[in-house]
């Protein structure tokens, strides 16, 4: 929040074009390509439900705009795609507004591990609310524990290590399905927007530490075979003092 405010003040004073703040039209229009790529990867169809993490609010309304432009151009069928906003419970000003039926976003002080989406006063929050309303979607939030559990679930089932924004999206999608807002048998796009390497500290303490072994093939085989018998993955640190790990 403070950085966005400062960048806006700098742009006003010096006439500079700071590309990664919400008030730059070229930046926000560029976010539509995310929606275009979703349609392309779906074989030029739209998912019936798209869940997007919300920070400053730039991406979600532009995904919705991308969908509407594709529909108007006749490139995809209008299947009434719904858009959902996903936020951390410790910073959920947009979701709170959606639930309350308000257009006004009330700023919050972020308290969450999901730092990349911890924007307490989102500049484009109003447009997120409008896109969600127009599409017939909803807003959902997830606790820090739910976010971590979702990160682990995605890694275990899909081999994808996401940072907390993606964990938030998955956790919120699960809750939307369980609450009946998203049918289980319809197409769902879960937006995973960041790599877990950005926030390694989030999962530290939530996973088993690696087993250290000497740099011997027999020692490695023993650990792997033991893990296979137990039906578990085997994190291994090879060699004394080594930071190499093999799943």
What are these regions (language model features)?
Residues 3-19, 69-161, 205-231, 235-238, ...:
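Active-site/ligand-binding loops adjacent to catalytic centers
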Residues 9-74, 148-152:
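Active-site/ligand-binding-proximal alpha/beta "capping" segment
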Residues 30-31, 62-63, 94-101, 200-202:
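Short, well-ordered secondary-structure micro-motifs
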Residues 38, 50-51, 83, 117, ...:
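Buried hydrophobic positions in well-ordered alpha/beta secondary-structure cores of metabolic enzymes
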Residues 48-53, 78-86, 185-191:
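Beta-strand segments within the central parallel beta-sheet cores of soluble alpha/beta enzyme folds
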Residues 54-63, 91-94, 165-173:
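Short glycine/serine/threonine-rich phosphate/pyrophosphate-binding segments
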Residues 170-231:
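Catalytic phosphate/nucleotide-handling subdomain of diverse soluble enzymes
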Residues 240-242:
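Low-complexity, intrinsically disordered Ser/Thr/Pro- and acidic-rich segments
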């Amino acid at each position: 929040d403070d950085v966005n405010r400062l960048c806006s003040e700098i742009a006003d004073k010096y006439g500079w074009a700071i590309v990664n703040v919400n008030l730059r039209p070229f930046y926000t229009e560029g976010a539509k390509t995310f929606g275009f790529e979703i349609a392309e990867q779906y074989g030029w169809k739209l998912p019936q439900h798209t869940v997007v993490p919300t920070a400053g609010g730039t991406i979600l309304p532009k995904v919705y705009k991308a969908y509407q432009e594709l529909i108007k151009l006749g490139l995809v069928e209008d299947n009434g795609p719904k858009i959902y906003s996903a936020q951390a419970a410790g910073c959920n000003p947009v979701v709170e507004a959606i639930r309350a039926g308000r257009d006004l976003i009330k700023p919050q002080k972020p308290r969450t591990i999901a730092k990349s989406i911890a924007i307490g006063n989102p500049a484009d929050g109003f447009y997120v609310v409008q896109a969600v309303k127009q599409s017939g979607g909803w807003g959902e939030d997830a606790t820090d524990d739910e976010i971590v559990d979702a990160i682990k679930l995605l890694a275990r089932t899909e081999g994808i290590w996401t940072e907390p924004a993606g964990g938030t999206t998955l956790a919120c999608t699960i809750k939307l399905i369980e609450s009946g807002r998203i049918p289980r048998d319809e197409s769902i796009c879960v937006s995973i927007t960041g790599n877990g390497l950005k926030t390694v500290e989030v999962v530290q303490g939530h996973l088993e530490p690696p087993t250290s072994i000497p740099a011997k093939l027999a020692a490695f085989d023993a650990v792997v075979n033991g893990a296979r018998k137990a039906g578990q993955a085997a994190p291994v640190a090879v060699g004394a003092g080594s930071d190499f790990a093999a799943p």
